[in-house]
Amino acid sequence: MSLLSDLINLNLSDITDKVIAEYIWVGGSGMDMRSKARTLSGPVKDPSKLPKWNYDGSSTGQAPGQDSEVILYPQAIFKDPFRRGSNILVMCDAYTPAGEPIPTNKRNNAAKIFGHPDVAAEEPWYGLEQEYTLLQKDVQWPLGWPLGGFPGPQGPYYCGTGANKAFGRDIVDSHYKACIYAGINISGINGEVMPGQWEFQVGPSIGISAADELWVARYILERITEIAGVVLSFDPKPIQGDWNGAGAHTNYSTKSMRNDGGYEVIKKAIAKLEKRHKEHIAAYGEGNERRLTGRHETADMNTFVWGVANRGASIRVGRDTEKAGKGYFEDRRPASNMDPYVVTSMIAETTILWKP
């Protein structure tokens, strides 16, 4: 095993200029992540300089067998925390050979929204809070929970420490450092209310970069849990009963909101979001109805409510924002399995471009 470990950690930069590029894309379910690697003749820092590539879309649920070729377009580059050196992770989106985005390519439409002059002028910032649950591999039961049983009730686990409260911290810290190494703007981590559940935050990041970074952070976490022999779940309600679900709270601001008088802009934006509540809920993640029940720090999905410092609201405004008269707000509706390309661009579209 020591030889295998040595080979895994082999530093190729001592002997060659060649680098390995791991191309990453979103699979057919809209949540599964796929990747494959190729050799490049030398380091590349601009995604437009990377070659397009193809894959078998019939094996990912993204193309029929008789016309299975799907084309990957490189969009964002990150340092590879697994191979290190000059090796890279490449976030891609997927197109038909004719150049049309495939149905599961949500990045293409997001890029159009973020590229709109009115949106670009507002410089939308996002802070994405990604909750997730770690499961024991063979039984699909949360890490640290007794087999076939339940731990003590919620209370001591949120930001808790100790062997009977925090389960999987090595995975969480490894992921934190790996994201920083990769160049992802990860801003923090914490243990969540349900034992075995954790959260990391990405941002503040501007526009589509926030979604690129969250997808790659998810990919890195998936790879780390693979190494650890633990299953990663983004199910918005992994355990039924008196246990918190998992969300992806989305913090958002525009230049107008961050400037003096921004609180009035925030209130107008929230009024727009209320008018399109059903459309947003429909796009905010599969199975979210099991989470948005009005309990466990959520608002009922059929009701829109906003408030200051209210974690039972659809939209929460922080007390600092209210006091300063400018700042940001938090959309608490997105589920943990949401597509960040969809959610971030939809919030921008509704609050900046949409005319009621």
UniProtKB/Swiss-Prot annotation:
Q: In which tissues is it expressed?
A: This is a nodule isozyme.
Cite the entry's keywords alphabetically: ATP-binding, Cytoplasm, Ligase, Nitrogen fixation, Nucleotide-binding
Which parts of the sequence belong to the GS beta-grasp domain? 19-99
> What is the residue range of the signal peptide feature?
none
Q: Which GO terms describe its cellular component?
A: cytoplasm
Q: Which GO terms describe its molecular function?
A: ATP binding; glutamine synthetase activity; identical protein binding
Its domain of life?
Eukaryota
- List GO BP terms, alphabetically: glutamine biosynthetic process
Catalytic activity, per the record? L-glutamate + NH4(+) + ATP = L-glutamine + ADP + phosphate + H(+)
Identify the EC number(s).
6.3.1.2
Ranges where the GS catalytic domain occurs: 106-356
Cellular location(s): Cytoplasm
What family classification does the UniProt entry report for this protein? Belongs to the glutamine synthetase family.
What quaternary arrangement does the UniProt entry report?
Answer: Homooctamer.
Q: What name has this protein been given in UniProt?
A: Glutamine synthetase cytosolic isozyme 2
In its UniProt entry, the species of origin is given as Glycine max
Q: What is the lineage of its organism?
A: Eukaryota, Viridiplantae, Streptophyta, Embryophyta, Tracheophyta
